[in-house]
Protein backbone atom coordinates (compact mmCIF):
# COMPACT_ATOMS: atom_id res chain seq x y z
CA UNK A 1 0.00 0.00 0.00
CA UNK A 2 2.84 2.36 0.83
CA UNK A 3 4.49 1.65 -2.46
CA UNK A 4 1.42 2.62 -4.40
CA UNK A 5 1.21 6.01 -2.63
CA UNK A 6 4.82 6.89 -3.42
CA UNK A 7 4.36 6.06 -7.05
CA UNK A 8 1.24 8.19 -7.20
CA UNK A 9 3.09 11.23 -5.76
CA UNK A 10 5.91 10.89 -8.26
CA UNK A 11 3.46 10.78 -11.13
CA UNK A 12 1.66 13.90 -9.87
CA UNK A 13 4.92 15.86 -9.59
CA UNK A 14 5.97 14.87 -13.08
CA UNK A 15 2.64 16.03 -14.45
CA UNK A 16 2.87 19.32 -12.52
CA UNK A 17 6.29 20.26 -13.96
CA UNK A 18 5.15 20.43 -17.58
CA UNK A 19 2.11 22.44 -16.51
CA UNK A 20 4.30 24.98 -14.70
CA UNK A 21 6.64 25.25 -17.67
CA UNK A 22 3.72 25.78 -20.01
CA UNK A 23 2.31 28.51 -17.78
CA UNK A 24 5.70 30.21 -17.62
CA UNK A 25 6.12 30.02 -21.38
CA UNK A 26 2.60 31.33 -21.89
CA UNK A 27 3.32 34.18 -19.47
CA UNK A 28 6.42 35.15 -21.39
CA UNK A 29 4.55 34.91 -24.68
CA UNK A 30 1.75 37.10 -23.32
CA UNK A 31 4.10 39.88 -22.26
CA UNK A 32 3.60 43.08 -24.14
CA UNK A 33 6.51 45.36 -24.71
CA UNK A 34 5.50 48.87 -23.76
CA UNK A 35 8.53 51.13 -24.33
CA UNK A 36 12.24 51.55 -23.80
CA UNK A 37 13.92 54.46 -22.08
CA UNK A 38 17.56 55.42 -22.54
CA UNK A 39 18.58 56.77 -19.17
CA UNK A 40 20.26 60.16 -19.08
CA UNK A 41 22.92 61.41 -16.64
CA UNK A 42 20.18 63.12 -14.63
CA UNK A 43 18.18 59.87 -14.48
CA UNK A 44 21.06 58.10 -12.76
CA UNK A 45 22.27 61.16 -10.87
CA UNK A 46 21.46 62.71 -7.51
CA UNK A 47 17.89 63.65 -8.41
CA UNK A 48 16.78 60.06 -7.72
CA UNK A 49 14.09 60.05 -10.36
CA UNK A 50 13.38 58.62 -13.79
CA UNK A 51 11.58 60.79 -16.31
CA UNK A 52 8.99 58.86 -18.33
CA UNK A 53 8.30 60.23 -21.83
CA UNK A 54 4.92 61.96 -21.88
CA UNK A 55 3.46 59.92 -24.74
CA UNK A 56 4.27 56.63 -22.98
CA UNK A 57 3.20 57.85 -19.55
CA UNK A 58 -0.23 58.96 -20.70
CA UNK A 59 -0.76 55.75 -22.64
CA UNK A 60 0.44 53.09 -20.21
CA UNK A 61 0.37 54.83 -16.82
CA UNK A 62 -2.52 57.29 -16.93
CA UNK A 63 -3.23 59.34 -13.81
CA UNK A 64 -6.65 60.57 -12.73
CA UNK A 65 -7.34 63.67 -10.70
CA UNK A 66 -7.43 61.79 -7.40
CA UNK A 67 -4.08 60.10 -7.84
CA UNK A 68 -2.37 63.04 -9.48
CA UNK A 69 -1.37 64.70 -6.22
CA UNK A 70 -0.04 61.72 -4.29
CA UNK A 71 0.85 59.56 -7.25
CA UNK A 72 0.64 55.81 -7.70
CA UNK A 73 2.69 52.91 -6.45
CA UNK A 74 3.67 50.67 -9.37
CA UNK A 75 4.97 47.17 -8.74
CA UNK A 76 7.42 45.64 -11.23
CA UNK A 77 9.26 42.36 -11.52
CA UNK A 78 12.63 41.85 -13.13
CA UNK A 79 13.77 38.73 -14.97
CA UNK A 80 15.00 37.16 -11.76
CA UNK A 81 11.58 37.51 -10.15
CA UNK A 82 12.66 40.26 -7.77
CA UNK A 83 9.98 42.85 -7.01
CA UNK A 84 10.52 46.59 -7.40
CA UNK A 85 8.12 49.30 -6.23
CA UNK A 86 8.25 52.83 -7.65
CA UNK A 87 6.21 55.89 -6.85
CA UNK A 88 4.86 57.33 -10.06
CA UNK A 89 3.59 60.92 -10.15
CA UNK A 90 3.35 64.10 -12.18
CA UNK A 91 5.54 67.12 -11.42
CA UNK A 92 3.86 70.42 -12.16
CA UNK A 93 7.12 72.35 -11.83
CA UNK A 94 8.77 70.53 -14.71
CA UNK A 95 5.54 69.26 -16.29
CA UNK A 96 6.91 65.74 -16.49
CA UNK A 97 5.96 62.25 -15.39
CA UNK A 98 8.52 60.72 -13.06
CA UNK A 99 9.25 57.63 -10.99
CA UNK A 100 10.79 58.68 -7.71
CA UNK A 101 10.69 56.47 -4.63
CA UNK A 102 12.50 53.17 -5.14
CA UNK A 103 14.24 54.23 -8.34
CA UNK A 104 17.60 55.04 -6.72
CA UNK A 105 17.70 51.56 -5.20
CA UNK A 106 17.16 50.01 -8.63
CA UNK A 107 19.96 52.14 -10.11
CA UNK A 108 22.41 51.05 -7.43
CA UNK A 109 21.44 47.40 -7.64
CA UNK A 110 21.79 47.22 -11.43
CA UNK A 111 24.71 49.69 -11.54
CA UNK A 112 23.10 51.70 -14.29
CA UNK A 113 25.09 54.28 -16.22
CA UNK A 114 24.04 57.00 -18.59
CA UNK A 115 23.21 55.48 -21.95
CA UNK A 116 21.90 52.19 -20.59
CA UNK A 117 18.42 51.12 -21.66
CA UNK A 118 15.51 50.33 -19.34
CA UNK A 119 12.68 48.28 -20.86
CA UNK A 120 9.10 48.17 -19.57
CA UNK A 121 6.73 45.28 -20.26
CA UNK A 122 3.38 44.09 -19.04
CA UNK A 123 1.32 40.89 -19.02
CA UNK A 124 -2.43 41.38 -19.29
CA UNK A 125 -4.59 39.05 -17.17
CA UNK A 126 -7.45 36.95 -18.37
CA UNK A 127 -9.95 39.61 -17.32
CA UNK A 128 -8.17 42.24 -19.34
CA UNK A 129 -8.06 44.61 -16.35
CA UNK A 130 -5.40 43.28 -14.04
CA UNK A 131 -1.87 43.27 -15.45
CA UNK A 132 1.59 42.48 -14.18
CA UNK A 133 4.39 44.92 -14.86
CA UNK A 134 7.92 43.87 -15.71
CA UNK A 135 11.11 45.85 -15.89
CA UNK A 136 14.34 44.89 -17.60
CA UNK A 137 17.55 46.65 -18.51
CA UNK A 138 20.58 46.24 -20.77
CA UNK A 139 23.85 48.00 -21.30
CA UNK A 140 24.22 50.63 -23.94
CA UNK A 141 25.33 49.19 -27.27
CA UNK A 142 28.96 49.44 -28.16
CA UNK A 143 29.70 51.55 -31.20
CA UNK A 144 31.55 49.39 -33.73
CA UNK A 145 34.80 50.65 -35.15
CA UNK A 146 33.97 52.20 -38.47
CA UNK A 147 36.58 51.61 -41.19
CA UNK A 148 36.52 55.30 -41.96
CA UNK A 149 38.06 56.03 -38.57
CA UNK A 150 40.84 53.51 -38.89
CA UNK A 151 44.39 54.58 -38.16
CA UNK A 152 45.64 56.87 -40.89
CA UNK A 153 42.28 57.22 -42.62
CA UNK A 154 41.36 60.41 -40.79
CA UNK A 155 44.54 62.07 -42.03
CA UNK A 156 44.83 61.32 -45.74
CA UNK A 157 47.80 63.62 -46.21
CA UNK A 158 51.07 63.80 -44.34
CA UNK A 159 53.72 66.42 -44.83
CA UNK A 160 57.47 66.38 -45.26
CA UNK A 161 60.06 68.96 -46.04
CA UNK A 162 61.07 69.96 -49.56
CA UNK A 163 64.52 69.26 -50.89
CA UNK A 164 67.16 71.99 -50.92
CA UNK A 165 66.56 72.66 -54.61
CA UNK A 166 63.35 74.49 -53.72
CA UNK A 167 64.61 76.57 -50.80
CA UNK A 168 64.73 80.36 -50.86
CA UNK A 169 68.34 80.32 -49.78
CA UNK A 170 69.60 77.91 -52.42
CA UNK A 171 69.23 80.27 -55.39
CA UNK A 172 71.58 82.73 -53.66
CA UNK A 173 74.22 80.23 -52.57
CA UNK A 174 74.04 77.29 -54.98
CA UNK A 175 77.10 78.39 -56.94
CA UNK A 176 79.15 78.54 -53.71
CA UNK A 177 78.23 75.41 -51.80
CA UNK A 178 75.76 73.31 -53.78
CA UNK A 179 76.27 69.79 -52.56
CA UNK A 180 72.91 68.17 -53.34
CA UNK A 181 72.44 67.24 -49.70
CA UNK A 182 71.73 69.41 -46.68
CA UNK A 183 72.47 73.06 -46.03
CA UNK A 184 75.90 74.49 -45.29
CA UNK A 185 75.01 76.16 -42.02
CA UNK A 186 78.52 77.58 -41.48
CA UNK A 187 78.16 79.92 -44.47
CA UNK A 188 74.71 81.23 -43.56
CA UNK A 189 74.80 84.94 -42.57
CA UNK A 190 73.35 86.08 -39.29
CA UNK A 191 70.49 87.75 -41.12
CA UNK A 192 69.17 84.35 -42.12
CA UNK A 193 66.56 82.94 -39.75
CA UNK A 194 64.87 79.61 -39.51
CA UNK A 195 61.45 78.73 -40.80
CA UNK A 196 59.31 75.68 -41.39
CA UNK A 197 58.38 74.34 -44.79
CA UNK A 198 55.95 71.53 -45.53
CA UNK A 199 54.75 69.94 -48.70
CA UNK A 200 51.97 67.50 -49.29
CA UNK A 201 52.68 63.90 -50.16
CA UNK A 202 50.48 62.74 -53.00
CA UNK A 203 48.92 59.40 -52.10
CA UNK A 204 48.23 58.59 -55.69
CA UNK A 205 51.95 58.40 -56.44
CA UNK A 206 52.91 56.86 -53.12
CA UNK A 207 49.95 55.14 -51.40
CA UNK A 208 52.12 53.72 -48.62
CA UNK A 209 53.34 57.15 -47.53
CA UNK A 210 50.03 58.00 -45.89
CA UNK A 211 50.43 55.21 -43.37
CA UNK A 212 54.15 54.44 -43.10
CA UNK A 213 55.79 57.90 -43.24
CA UNK A 214 55.79 59.80 -39.93
CA UNK A 215 55.27 63.51 -39.66
CA UNK A 216 58.68 65.21 -39.52
CA UNK A 217 59.17 68.85 -38.65
CA UNK A 218 62.60 70.44 -38.77
CA UNK A 219 63.87 73.95 -39.26
CA UNK A 220 65.53 75.14 -42.46
CA UNK A 221 67.24 78.47 -43.07
CA UNK A 222 65.15 81.13 -44.70
CA UNK A 223 66.18 84.62 -45.72
CA UNK A 224 64.70 87.45 -43.71
CA UNK A 225 63.03 90.21 -45.66
CA UNK A 226 65.08 93.21 -46.63
CA UNK A 227 68.19 93.11 -44.48
CA UNK A 228 69.89 90.10 -46.02
CA UNK A 229 69.63 91.52 -49.53
CA UNK A 230 71.21 94.76 -48.43
CA UNK A 231 74.01 92.94 -46.61
CA UNK A 232 74.82 90.78 -49.64
CA UNK A 233 74.99 93.82 -51.88
CA UNK A 234 77.14 95.67 -49.37
CA UNK A 235 79.63 92.88 -48.82
CA UNK A 236 80.04 92.37 -52.54
CA UNK A 237 81.67 95.83 -52.65
CA UNK A 238 82.63 98.10 -55.55
CA UNK A 239 86.10 98.78 -56.91
CA UNK A 240 87.32 102.11 -58.28
CA UNK A 241 90.72 103.16 -59.56
CA UNK A 242 91.44 106.80 -58.85
CA UNK A 243 94.81 108.43 -59.44
CA UNK A 244 96.52 105.07 -59.73
CA UNK A 245 95.02 103.82 -56.49
CA UNK A 246 92.68 100.79 -56.31
CA UNK A 247 89.88 101.51 -53.86
CA UNK A 248 87.17 99.16 -52.61
CA UNK A 249 84.19 100.72 -50.85
CA UNK A 250 81.28 99.10 -49.00
CA UNK A 251 77.59 99.81 -49.02
CA UNK A 252 77.53 102.85 -46.78
CA UNK A 253 79.83 104.83 -49.03
CA UNK A 254 82.79 107.05 -48.13
CA UNK A 255 83.34 109.43 -45.26
CA UNK A 256 82.52 113.10 -45.54
CA UNK A 257 86.16 114.16 -45.80
CA UNK A 258 86.80 111.74 -48.65
CA UNK A 259 83.70 112.88 -50.50
CA UNK A 260 84.78 116.52 -50.21
CA UNK A 261 88.25 115.78 -51.52
CA UNK A 262 86.97 113.67 -54.39
CA UNK A 263 84.36 116.27 -55.35
CA UNK A 264 86.97 119.06 -55.35
CA UNK A 265 89.15 117.04 -57.70
CA UNK A 266 86.32 116.70 -60.17
CA UNK A 267 85.87 112.99 -59.61
CA UNK A 268 82.91 111.17 -58.18
CA UNK A 269 82.67 107.95 -56.34
CA UNK A 270 79.74 105.56 -56.83
CA UNK A 271 77.60 104.85 -53.80
CA UNK A 272 76.20 101.54 -52.62
CA UNK A 273 72.61 100.54 -51.97
CA UNK A 274 72.39 103.40 -49.43
CA UNK A 275 71.28 103.38 -45.84
CA UNK A 276 72.85 100.06 -44.78
CA UNK A 277 74.53 99.34 -41.44
CA UNK A 278 77.55 101.66 -41.21
CA UNK A 279 79.36 99.41 -38.76
CA UNK A 280 79.58 96.60 -41.29
CA UNK A 281 80.79 98.81 -44.17
CA UNK A 282 84.49 99.22 -44.86
CA UNK A 283 86.81 101.30 -46.96
CA UNK A 284 90.08 99.86 -48.21
CA UNK A 285 92.82 101.30 -50.39
CA UNK A 286 95.33 99.30 -52.27
CA UNK A 287 98.25 101.09 -53.95
CA UNK A 288 98.94 100.32 -57.55
CA UNK A 289 102.78 100.64 -57.63
CA UNK A 290 105.79 100.78 -55.36
CA UNK A 291 106.40 104.45 -56.28
CA UNK A 292 103.04 105.33 -54.92
CA UNK A 293 103.89 103.42 -51.74
CA UNK A 294 107.00 105.59 -51.32
CA UNK A 295 104.93 108.68 -51.99
CA UNK A 296 102.57 107.95 -49.13
CA UNK A 297 105.39 106.83 -46.86
CA UNK A 298 107.26 110.12 -47.26
CA UNK A 299 104.21 112.08 -46.35
CA UNK A 300 103.90 110.06 -43.15
CA UNK A 301 100.18 110.19 -43.11
CA UNK A 302 98.09 107.30 -41.90
CA UNK A 303 94.90 108.64 -43.42
CA UNK A 304 94.08 109.00 -47.09
CA UNK A 305 94.52 112.40 -48.75
CA UNK A 306 94.81 113.60 -52.33
CA UNK A 307 97.21 116.30 -53.59
CA UNK A 308 95.63 117.87 -56.62
CA UNK A 309 98.82 119.82 -57.51
CA UNK A 310 100.54 116.58 -58.52
UniProtKB/Swiss-Prot annotation:
Range of residues in the leader sequence: none
GO biological process: flower development; leaf development; regulation of leaf morphogenesis
Ranges of compositional bias, category Low complexity: 251-268
This protein's record includes keyword Nucleus: yes
Pfam families documented for this protein: B3
DNA-binding region boundaries: 35-141
Name of the protein: B3 domain-containing transcription factor NGA1
Cellular compartment(s): Nucleus
One MF term in the entry's GO annotations: sequence-specific DNA binding
Database matches in SUPFAM superfamilies: DNA-binding pseudobarrel domain (SSF101936)
A GO CC term attached to the entry: nucleus
Organism: Arabidopsis thaliana
The keyword Nucleus belongs to this UniProt entry's keyword annotation: yes
Ranges for region Disordered: 1-26, 251-310
Matching PANTHER family: B3 DOMAIN-CONTAINING TRANSCRIPTION FACTOR ABI3, B3 DOMAIN-CONTAINING TRANSCRIPTION FACTOR NGA1
Annotated function: Regulates lateral organ growth. Functionally redundant with NGA2, NGA3 and NGA4.
Biased composition regions of type Basic and acidic residues, renumbered to the chain: 16-26
Keywords of this entry: DNA-binding, Nucleus, Transcription, Transcription regulation
Subunit structure: Interacts with BRX. Interacts with BZIP30.
Amino acid sequence: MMTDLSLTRDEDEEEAKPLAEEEGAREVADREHMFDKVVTPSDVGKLNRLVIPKQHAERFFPLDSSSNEKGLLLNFEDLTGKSWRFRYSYWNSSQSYVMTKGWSRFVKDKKLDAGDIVSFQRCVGDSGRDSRLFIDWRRRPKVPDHPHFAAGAMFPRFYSFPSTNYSLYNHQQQRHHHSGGGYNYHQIPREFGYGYFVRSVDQRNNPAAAVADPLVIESVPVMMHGRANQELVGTAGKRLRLFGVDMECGESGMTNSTEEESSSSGGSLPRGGGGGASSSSFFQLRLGSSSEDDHFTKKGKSSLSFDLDQ
